[in-house]
Amino acid sequence: MKNAWMLPLLAALAGCATPTAAPVLGTRPSYLESVTADVPNGAALRHRIWTPALDEGYVPQGLTSAGAHLFVSSYKPTPDLKANTGPCRVFRIEIASGTIAGHFDIPPGTCTHSGGMAYLGQGKLFLADTRALFLIDVDKALASGTSAGASKSIKITGELRGSYATFDGKDPWIGTWTKEQPKARMFRLDQRLFDEFDGQTVRENRAAESIPVPLEAQGAAFDKAGNLWVSASNGQWGKLYRLDRQGAVKAAYDMVAGLEDLTVDEAGRLWGLSESGTRKYLHWPTRFPHIFQIDPARLK
């Protein structure tokens, strides 16, 4: 009992202790002992969720939101992890818990990378693959586990490339990942293309508009104020840009390597994800296979 006097002091110190970081939601991969703790602007990356099906080898690419859920499009490198293409799968994830709440596959051979997604409202999901675009009835696809019989599609050629996708509230957009400045552009499309050209091929002359974007762009999202956020990355670095509606860069921030697609949810919150730390990219110096909310006010 001689140390009983210490109990109130210890209780007081415990109350003043710095709170631990919030746990990462979702399913932690079995192969990853730790993640990179110090990533650029890490203080702005909140509500972290493990990207889906990491143990199965899926590489996350596209990201969009609908109500209480996020949707992630991924591909499974095939025949092995050296491949940059493979079967595509779309996962639905509960924002609050990080739990996978269903998934569906894109028919084999029709999608190989699933670079970007955008939710267009009324149950319609827009998915961009390198040379194909899909308009998917989400409820039907989730119910059957496949988008077969639940989608329309068009092939794209010429300057059109489905490296990523977004939605401005009226029209879907697609953009090109490239290291060549003249080719670094986003294109605004009309949803009616899926009615007029379902199963056919279109090129850039069918785009309603195009604007320039930064090099090596991986994702894009319009916020409620009309800003266009664009992500760019490779295995060594990541960038987050804020552009105006005409494509002029207004701000740039360092971000986690492997930063892929972006989305803005119904509450106006900006989200992103990184493909670093997936089985395919374990040789990268960064391991951060998370979906995360980005707080613009904390970016430096």
Where on the chain are the PLM-derived regions?
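A short helix->beta-strand "capping" segment at the edge of beta-propeller domains
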Residues: 31-56, 203-205
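Beta-strand-rich domains and repeat architectures in extracellular enzymes and scaffolds
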Residues: 48-86
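Surface loop/turn motifs at the tips and blade-to-blade linkers of beta-strand repeat domains
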Residues: 51-55, 104-110, 153-158, 208-214, ...
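Repeated scaffold domains used in trafficking and secretory/extracellular systems
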Residues: 57-62, 111-116, 157-167, 214-219, ...
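Residue-level detector of Asp-centered blade-edge/turn motifs that repeat once per structural unit
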Residues: 65-67, 119-122, 167-169, 222-225, ...
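Conserved beta-propeller blade signature
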Residues: 70-72, 124-127, 172-175, 228-230, ...
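Structural motif
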Residues: 81-89, 132-138, 181-190, 236-241, ...
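Loop/turn-rich, solvent-exposed surfaces of beta-rich toroidal or solenoidal domains
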Residues: 207-243
